[in-house]
Amino acid sequence: MGVVTLQGYIVVPDTDLASVQDVLLEHIELTQREHGCLHFTVSQDTENKNRFNVHEKFVNRAAFEAHQRRAKDSRWVHIAANIERHYQISEDS
């Protein structure tokens, strides 16, 4: 099992934009502290305020799945329930 990379973007509806921005930093900080997280960034697009570019790297599939489980129990998942997710996930061999 190799490094798992998630790349893509999310689109946040206008109605949720302020709430997402309020909890995003906490979500980033919690994720960056997770065992196995190599890289985690979410940055607002410079041309589209509703688009946030996402780049994640975890040491392996187990670390990536642990992140997914942790995020499901966080404030982030409730605030971000209405966002559109556009991701590509790859795994190095």
Give residue spans per PLM region.
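Short, well-ordered beta-strand segments in beta-rich or mixed alpha/beta enzyme
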Residues: 4-10, 41-68
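Short, surface-exposed ligand-recognition loops at beta-strand->loop->(often short) alpha-helix junctions
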Residues: 11-17
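Short, conserved structural micro-motifs that define repeat-unit consensus positions
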Residues: 27, 37-40
